[in-house]
Amino acid sequence: MNFETVIGLEVHVELNTNSKIFSPSSAHFGQEQNANTNVIDWSFPGVLPVMNKGVVDAGIKAALALNMDIHQNMHFDRKNYFYPDNPKAYQISQFDEPIGYNGWIEIELEDGTRKKIRIERAHLEEDAGKNTHGTDGYSYVDLNRQGVPLIEIVSEADMRSPEEAYAYLTALKEIIQYTGISDVKMEEGSMRVDANISLRPYGQEEFGTKAELKNLNSFNNVRKGLIHEEKRQAQVLRSGGQIQQETRRFDETTGETILMRVKEGSSDYRYFPEPDLPLFDISDEWIDQVRLELPEFPQERRAKYVSSFGLSSYDASQLTATKATSDFFEKAVAIGGDAKQVSNWLQGEVAQFLNSESKSIEEIGLTPENLVEMISLIADGTISSKIAKKVFVHLAKNGGSAEEFVKKAGLVQISDPEVLIPIIHQVFADNEAAVIDFKSGKRNADKAFTGYLMKATKGQANPQVALKLLAQELAKLKEE
């Protein structure tokens, strides 16, 4: 029997506000344990939460970006559970009226077609703290993360393969990143994914029993975990077994999912309205104001890059993968850069440098201005493409003017025949054996002189001019 895979994803996104959702403590990542806390985070008796308006702004922005309806009479609820990293013994979240609902985004499938994935809801909530277990037998609680604002985005179970899940996460991350409400860095915990997967016989409308996958710390691991779970469930069903509702974690080493716990039913968190926070009236004017702040999104930019700049769909997708790169490209083209040349550099040398240095394009010295300046120096023959790579590395590390560095470093390309011809003659004099081979008609003997000439000029000879002059002087040499 063949089975259809059914996947839904729950994505927690940490919002990049300066302060926490209900307290004035800093929400910044990477501080000393419990440095970003105050009496509200520690839940001292008598303290009350105060709503951070910036979090609501971010929630509205996310809802609009994900084509969602907005609950304009919004409220919060208490989600009751006990855990050491949750000092209140409840989490302030949203239950029956999330800020956003009934949304969708489009993903691109492997065959180039597009598919709409529905989004059930997006709700605001506070993050919990973090437990660490020491080698001394004690467990320690760090409440820096307690109260950091989150938006949880819950998809409908519309994905039918691990690849579709991967495409959905990629598209969702791009959209959220473009809004500016989060840096969506999984390695820092600002984007976390739980996956729900079940199988059902083709043609059956009712969902099968699902398993929830956790410990998915990268998009690749989401895909790998789903692939393994898909195979595991199919094997169980084909052997006559039944799938239990359970939570499993993905083991990165083995590539397998491992049982954490069996769920006997839905967790009862005894939700009830948060009594310490008022209802929030999100007016049409408020929504319209946030709408004005929305950027041009990746899909719109890709279409523009293909139609207006003549780039391929692949190039357009690569350039819009991050807003920073896309903004860089647009500014470079706006100041006169050739779109294809700028695209080639951003996808080639620039991308390699960023990967090797583990940096983003905003963190290096390269700017749209000095990249366009460098490309112009290549176009007018001032420097060769080979020399340009050296210039690029300098600009990336130090910034500044491309033209000034080229002049200061003596990297200007040699194009003057009166300079090149004496160098060619010296190459002949320094390589008598190669001259003898060439005169005797040895096959490909002329090719060696190209390397000798470039070495003699330290790569600064203009290739087109140099090769033409070299052919001319070799012809004379043969006649001697």
UniProtKB/Swiss-Prot annotation:
Origin species, per record, is: Streptococcus agalactiae serotype III (strain NEM316)
User: According to the UniProt entry, what is the EC number of this protein?
Assistant: 6.3.5.-
The UniProt catalytic activity note for this protein reads: L-glutamyl-tRNA(Gln) + L-glutamine + ATP + H2O = L-glutaminyl-tRNA(Gln) + L-glutamate + ADP + phosphate + H(+); L-aspartyl-tRNA(Asn) + L-glutamine + ATP + H2O = L-asparaginyl-tRNA(Asn) + L-glutamate + ADP + phosphate + 2 H(+)
Identification of the protein by name: Aspartyl/glutamyl-tRNA(Asn/Gln) amidotransferase subunit B
Q: Which family does the record assign?
A: Belongs to the GatB/GatE family. GatB subfamily.
Q: Which NCBIfam families match?
A: gatB, PRK05477.1-1, PRK05477.1-2, PRK05477.1-4
Q: Which residues form a coiled coil?
A: none
Does the record carry Transferase as a key word? no
Q: Which gene encodes it?
A: gatB
User: InterPro entries attached here?
Assistant: Asn/Gln-tRNA_amidoTrfase_suB/E (IPR017959), Asn/Gln-tRNA_Trfase_suB/E_cat (IPR006075), Asn/Gln_amidotransferase (IPR018027), Asn/Gln_tRNA_amidoTrase-B-like (IPR003789), GatB (IPR004413), GatB_C_1 (IPR042114), GatB_Yqey_C_2 (IPR023168), Gln-tRNA_amidoTrfase_suB_CS (IPR017958)
